[in-house]
Regions:
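Conserved SAM-binding motif I beta-strand of class I
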Residues: 34-39
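S-adenosyl-L-methionine
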Residues: 43-84
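Mobile active-site "lid"/loop adjacent to the S-adenosyl-L-methionine
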Residues: 63, 80-110
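C-terminal catalytic and target-recognition region of SAM-dependent MTase-like enzymes
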Residues: 106, 120-184
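Conserved SAM-binding loop of SAM-dependent methyltransferases across substrates and taxa
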Residues: 20-33
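Helix-to-beta-strand junctions that scaffold the AdoMet/dcAdoMet cofactor pocket
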Residues: 115-117
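Conserved class I S-adenosyl-L-methionine
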Residues: 10-17
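Class I SAM-dependent methyltransferase "Motif I" SAM/SAH-binding loop
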Residues: 17-21, 126
C-alpha cells in the first residue's frame, strides 16, 4: 500500500472493491489528485468514510457494484489514471475456480477499458485456488479483449504476517500484479 501511495501522487485513483478503503486511503495520503473507492457493501463504505475522516484524508466512497461502475465509467471522459482491482475471493475452492476465473477476466477487462491512456493497474486476488499464473492468464485474456497493451512491472504477494505452509500451496492466497496499460 505504501508503494501505491508513491505511484498515485498527482493522479486520479479508483479503488474498486475498496472494502474499508485501505488502498484508497494510502493513495490519498500519498498525494493523489483525486481518490474514489467503490464497494457494494454498505457497512464497508461507511467504515471507509470513517477511516478517511480519522486519517484526515480526502477520498470519495461510493456504494455500487464494481462491475457496473466500471461499465459506466468506460463511457466517461475523465478516467482514472491509477486503478486498483482488489475483489473479494471469487473462487473459494476448486469447484468454483472456473466461474471465479471468468469473473477475474471480466473485472480486469472492464477495468482496462475504463483506465486512462498510459494508466497504472494494480490487480489482486485473494483466492487460494487461483495461482499467480492464473491471475496472469486472466489479465492476458482481459488485455486481448480490451485491445490493450499491458506490461507487468511487478509481482507482489503476502506480507510476512501471512506465511505459506509448504504442504498447502493454497495458503499463498494473496497475489498482486502491477502493470502499465496502453491502448493498441
Amino acid at each position: 500500500r505504501r508503494d501505491l501511495a508513491v505511484l498515485a501522487k498527482g493522479r486520479r485513483v479508483l479503488d474498486v472493491c475498496t472494502y474499508t478503503g485501505g488502498f484508497a486511503l494510502h493513495a490519498a495520503a500519498g498525494g493523489a489528485a483525486s481518490v474514489t473507492g467503490v464497494d457494494l457493501d454498505e457497512k464497508a463504505i461507511a467504515t471507509a468514510k470513517r477511516n478517511a475522516k480519522l486519517n484526515q484524508v480526502k477520498a470519495r466512497f461510493v456504494q455500487a457494484d464494481g462491475f457496473h461502475y466500471l461499465r459506466q465509467l468506460s463511457n466517461q471522459d475523465e478516467r482514472p489514471e491509477v486503478l486498483i482491482l482488489d475483489p473479494p475471493k471469487f473462487a473459494r475452492d476448486r469447484n468454483e475456480k472456473e466461474e471465479g476465473m471468468r469473473r477475474y477476466r471480466d473485472l480486469n477487462r472492464l477495468g482496462l477499458e475504463a483506465l486512462a491512456e498510459d494508466g497504472l493497474l494494480l490487480t489482486c486476488s485473494c483466492s487460494g485456488v487461483v495461482s499467480e499464473d492464473d491471475l496472469l492468464d486472466a489479465l492476458r485474456n482481459a488485455a486481448a479483449r480490451a485491445n490493450r497493451e499491458v506490461t507487468v512491472f511487478r509481482f507482489s504477494g503476502p506480507a510476512p504476517d501471512h506465511p505459506m505452509a509448504l504442504h498447502a500451496p493454497e495458503t499463498r492466497y494473496l497475489k498482486a500484479l502491477w502493470a502499465r496499460v496502453r491502448k493498441l
